[in-house]
Amino acid sequence: MTNSQYSPQPMAAEFSEAMEKLVNACYSDPFRVLGPHPYQKGIVVRAYLPHAIQAWIGTEPPQEMARSSAINLFEWHGKAKALPLPYQVLWEDKMGFTHYEYDPYCFPPQLSDYDLHLFGEGKHWHVYRILGSHPVIVDGTSGVLFATWAPEAERVSIVGDFNRWDGRCHPMQLRGLTGVWELFIPGLKPGTLYKYELRNRNRGSIHLKSDPYGQRFEQRPHTASIVAAKTNYLWQDRKWMEQRKQFDWLHQPISVYEVHLGSWQRGENGAFLNYRQLARQLVDYVLKTGFTHIELLPVTEHPLDASWGYQTTGYFAPTSRFGSPDEFRYFVDHCHLHGIGVLMDWVPGHFPKDAHGLAQFDGSALYEHEDPRLGEHRDWGTLIFNYGRHEVRNFLLSSALYWLEEFHIDGLRVDAVASMLYLDYSRQEGDWIPNKYGGRENLEAIDFLRELNKVLHAQHPGVLVIAEESTSWPMVSHPIYVGGLGFSMKWNMGWMNDTLSYMSKDPIYRHYHHDALTFGLLYAFNENFMLPLSHDEVVHGKQSLLYKMPGDEWQRFANLRLLYTMMFTYPGKKLLFMGCEFGQGEEWNESRSLDWYLLNYPVHQGVQAAIKDLNHLYRSLPALNYYDFAKEGFEWIDCHDSAQSVLSYLRLKDGDFVIVVLNFTPVPRTNYRLGVPKSGVYLECFNSDSTYYGGSNMGNSQTIQTDSITWMGRPYSINITVPPLAGIVLRLKTPASKMPATAPLSPGK
């Protein structure tokens, strides 16, 4: 800061008023009175030091500053050339300790007007690079630049151990009408604990808040933000990232293993594994079981373990439960180096009311709507973002980009989209406000979701954005230019609900509910669907997937393998929650590890082996994955055999096909004639009743010859055995065809 840059000296009356506000911690323009200012033929330096009894200006030698005993304001008068810039202030506290500090108020503002303009327009996609806390060097002096958005604050201060958590010590500067406050504090380093102390301009209420843009936080139950170091992580996944740009996800197999990092596995005495340990152990396991992607329940920072991460307070911070941001980078990098994609759940639909978080951030409804009919989820006890506010939308868009860019995340599963789309979601009549057209659609949320998808797909080709949307809202996964929301995929909640409802019924009654399995194909290609058997289905008294199944133990496991056979051969990408792949018996509990001891039992080993081979089958046969989203990839053979509760269908890809036959009763269907599209020899390439998987080993010989008998509208047919509570996959044997290497053939009988 040159002499010409010194703030002009305020008039006496103005100065007196300003100092009164400063001392009372309600002043928005501390640079107006603190730091260096022209004074007569020289300059005056002022420092407000609430805990000092004596102070010196850092000239050579140091010169004592005059103290106003009433308010602890220290002044030094002198010639400009005698003052080094930047300069230090030395001060002694009541305990006799001397402190050496560069004066924050001798450094000019750092945020550009252009950055602030973009943020105000809601178009600063990388605003996380300027707001929050960032280690920087200003005029050769290292320190930390703090910036936050709080337009309804009268005063904002940075507080921490470095200033005894006293909001009088480091008041920030309000940047015009932008609502953004900033201050560079020299000498602070990464690892510093801090919060913002805000005083509301209307009520004078004081609010102590974590940093909305904080990139690291204390471990719960503590809530302070931590100044994060600039990353020095050296990524090794360049090849993966380049290939991702060309990833044809529409026509590639995607099989997702959904994971809660805190309860997948635990260490000694129930301790969390760290990101590095999880990377090595989880990647080895996913490679073994054959999934293509891992989807993480939210790793954004959150205060309550029991929320599973869905009540986020740190939208820019990997949770500190498992390690540092760089250790999370290692986790993602390690996955990529082994050919595994990483998706994460992201929660833009609501946020918690915790006092240290976003709620009433500056004493006003800043991030949320003020009217609870718009701004509160009463069922969940959370608040709803105000999507119509540019800066709030920018906050969320920047968060989404942050995870893709800083951590190389391959996609986001957007949580609770239905709650965003409908103004009357889970509300009684009279407890919601219609939109400007009188409807129940949340127009601002719709615009936000479209903008989110437009920005993410434009800036990061190949990245997936998946909607958890539980209603029949049209065109969720259709392009924006045709009126869609622009998501890559949508969870098929209808398939999940109908299928699990059907599978939970005693087989003797299933023939009455046959349409529960066939109905889904009426809309299966209306969206790009993912088939989810997620964490939500194995909690809150719903039971594990295994114990949703009826019958004795043998039948439960057979039903579970049958369910998985249907899932992996049905149109749509796949998602399976951890533990389901080996038949976890208990409901999921986030406070402890999965029951890995179950893999000591052959029947659980069998379920795991079935998942491994279904994954391999799905990934190896284009007929099972290429047209997951298109009707060209599916044909019924027979959907009408409700009397025997048998379904049969083709999955196809450009002339190649596989046949799937599913028997939903414990009665073996011997001499079951099935129409087929081509003559030749058929091979049974998967049988969920195989002894490999814990079944009864009923099935077919390794070759099945067609008969020239027209059947089910097909020119040829085969005579097969369909095992009890089982599914089989058949493939036409041709000279060019190769069976999947690890999918075992049933030995048959």
Swiss-Prot record:
It catalyses: Transfers a segment of a (1->4)-alpha-D-glucan chain to a primary hydroxy group in a similar glucan chain. The active site is at D415 (nucleophile), E468 (proton donor). InterPro entries: A-amylase/branching_C, Branching_enzy, GlgB, GlgB_N, GlgB_N_E_set_prok, Glyco_hydro_13_cat_dom, Glyco_hydro_13_N, Glyco_hydro_b. Belongs to the glycosyl hydrolase 13 family. GlgB subfamily. Pfam families: Alpha-amylase, Alpha-amylase_C, CBM_48, GlgB_N. Catalyzes the formation of the alpha-1,6-glucosidic linkages in glycogen by scission of a 1,4-alpha-linked oligosaccharide from growing alpha-1,4-glucan chains and the subsequent attachment of the oligosaccharide to the alpha-1,6 position. One of its GO terms (molecular function) is hydrolase activity, hydrolyzing O-glycosyl compounds. Its EC number is 2.4.1.18. The gene is glgB. Monomer. HAMAP family: GlgB. Pathway: Glycan biosynthesis; glycogen biosynthesis. The keyword Lipoprotein does not apply. This is 1,4-alpha-glucan branching enzyme GlgB. Gene3D superfamilies: Glycosidases, Golgi alpha-mannosidase II, Immunoglobulins. One of its GO terms (cellular component) is cytosol. Keywords: Carbohydrate metabolism, Glycogen biosynthesis, Glycogen metabolism, Glycosyltransferase, Transferase. It is an enzyme of class 2 (transferase). PANTHER family: 1,4-ALPHA-GLUCAN-BRANCHING ENZYME. It comes from the Bacteria. GO terms for biological process: glycogen biosynthetic process. CDD domains: AmyAc_Glg_BE, E_set_GBE_prok_N.
